[in-house]
């Protein structure tokens, strides 16, 4: 009696026919049909009690469920998901707990099943996620110890122009400090936005960026007009290695959340509509979206503004007593031990600090920022490479 590929009901009926023939014992039938003796006796008993109808598959759902989720709670979970389409079940529950602390809520997995049953779980195409930063965020464990800044791609407006969302986040709390659409990735539009962030939240200890404009350049120390201004404000400048966005993974994950939440609304919208969408995303991300890395708290509940207040009046860059100070000439050169050494025209008419470090090398800094080392053998400045957390500073 081979186990034939047929429907389960037909198989059960054939089993009963063979049993009724009295040619086989129950053990032989169970072995032949590849079922246990317990199952064989169950089929026989149901046939004897109910006839052929007793052989149909029965629902495994319990007749009564003492922990069934009330309909009003299900409705709240579904409504919250619809209001925040990018939220998963955990974030939906965390938001409901904030809004209604006294409301009893189901487990994360049950909430997930509720959303799936409501057709609100969309299967995503797989993308390799940004892993945890391969270098530890030594500077990003306290509020305002390290901020990240970058542009979130580009979105075309209804007028055919491009919008480049400039974003700033605090690494420790994940709080989005600024998210503003600009029409160009240049100093002229980046500085006013950064000034607003500084006025609103104070100054960080350090800022992490990639190596693109207007954050970095190929000049000494990679300085630009924007990052030079940061140095003059007493902010440490950190950069990721070229082509290594994983070193700014927290910020990149926020960008992914932004695109999933409002990417469709951004495309082809007016400039005002795009900025309204960016502002709405910030409010949701900061005040309503919980983060597991924050013990399922929101960024707004964790973040506090910096005690270092911003002043538009810059103080002269200071140097230590063990540093020799030189003025940078209009052509970007300094004079050292009888040699004219090119540093950077960006620093023309500014002062730099020099200190002999070892052998024939002389360290050159603008404020706390390392520009490079003068090689006395070649009388040239060898540029520094400043990377994120742990690199030269």
Question: Where are the regions a protein language model picked out?
Answer:
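C-terminal, beta-rich DNA-binding module of retroviral/retroelements integrases
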Residues: 282, 286-393
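Basic, flexible linker segments flanking DNA-binding modules
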Residues: 52-146, 154, 224, 298-310
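Mobile genetic element proteins and their domesticated derivatives, centered on retroelements
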Residues: 15, 29, 40, 51, ...
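Charged alpha-helix within mobile-element recombinases
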Residues: 219, 225-311, 353, 357-358
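Short, Lys/Arg-enriched anionic-surface-contact patches
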Residues: 1-14, 63-71
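Mobile-element integrase/transposase regions
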Residues: 109, 113-175, 183, 187-205, ...
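Short, amphipathic alpha-helical "recognition" segments used to contact nucleic acids or chromatin
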Residues: 7-24, 74-83
